[in-house]
A protein has these predicted regions:
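ATP-dependent small-molecule kinase phosphotransfer cores
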Residues: 41-118, 122-123
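Hydrophobic anchor at the beta1->P-loop junction of P-loop NTPases
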Residues: 15
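NTP-dependent small-molecule kinase module
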Residues: 2-7, 31, 147-199
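A glycine- and Lys/Arg-enriched "phosphate-lid" helix/loop adjacent to the NTP-binding pocket
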Residues: 104-163, 176-177
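Post-Walker A helix-loop "phosphate-sensing" segment adjacent to the P-loop in P-loop NTPases
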Residues: 32-41
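Walker A/P-loop
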Residues: 24
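ATP-binding Walker
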Residues: 20-21
Length: 199
């Protein structure tokens, strides 16, 4: 009998990249692999693990928000509110995140027009660091092939993801184009290769 797969406790696995590129699909597929106990925590940022952050995220998706800075501060509020839950989970389990702080930089700063709102990049990045500096990732799977058009997936967004990948090359794995089965198999193989998955 094949043992159930087990993600290394304490590890943080990130699914990052362009909108509509398959991240949430892969999060859902990975969550159904029949993990050994304690099974990993699977979640999405910024909706996260609490009722408060799910409510805030719903607000940012549905409400008409005039200020780009206000939208990003609401997202960062969700991130900060989820830190205790993520920290607790990593004490004995792995965590798989659908979006990390890279999305906040790329879609918040570069696509969110925060410079036009008078927010220096160094200030915005410092706010992100305050929230995320104690949650380093073991691996970031970067999705750069959207399966359908999204107006936010501009060339600048693609470039900035590539910049972050180069800046963090030691932990970044670019996901090749492929169907859902092939992509799941690729992620599993990469987790094994990095000694993050056994069984």
């Amino acid at each position: 009998m094949t043992p159930a797969p087990r993600l290394k406790p304490g590890s943080l696995v990130v699914l990052e990249g362009l909108d509509r590129s398959g991240k949430s699909t892969q999060r859902n597929r990975l969550s159904k692999l029949g993990w050994a106990e304690p099974d990993p925590v699977f979640t999405h940022m910024p909706s996260g693990l609490t009722s408060l952050t799910r409510s805030i995220y719903h607000l940012t998706e549905e409400a008409e928000i005039q200020s780009p800075l206000a939208r990003q501060l609401l997202h960062l509020t969700c991130h900060a509110e989820n830190m205790p839950a993520i920290t607790d989970a990593r004490q004995c389990r792995a965590v798989v995140l659908d979006r990390w702080w890279w999305s906040t930089v790329v879609y918040g700063w570069y696509a969110g027009h925060l410079l036009d709102a008078g927010v220096p990049e160094v200030v915005f990045r410092s706010m992100i660091d305050v929230v995320w500096s104690n949650q380093p990732a073991n691996v970031v799977f970067l999705f750069l092939t959207p399966f359908e058009h999204d107006e936010l997936n501009r060339d600048e967004v693609h470039r900035r993801y590539n910049d972050l990948a180069a800046e963090h090359s030691g932990i970044t794995v670019t996901v090749p184009p492929g169907n859902e089965d092939a992509t799941t198999a690729f992620i599993v193989d990469q987790l094994r290769a990095r000694d993050l998955l056994s069984g």
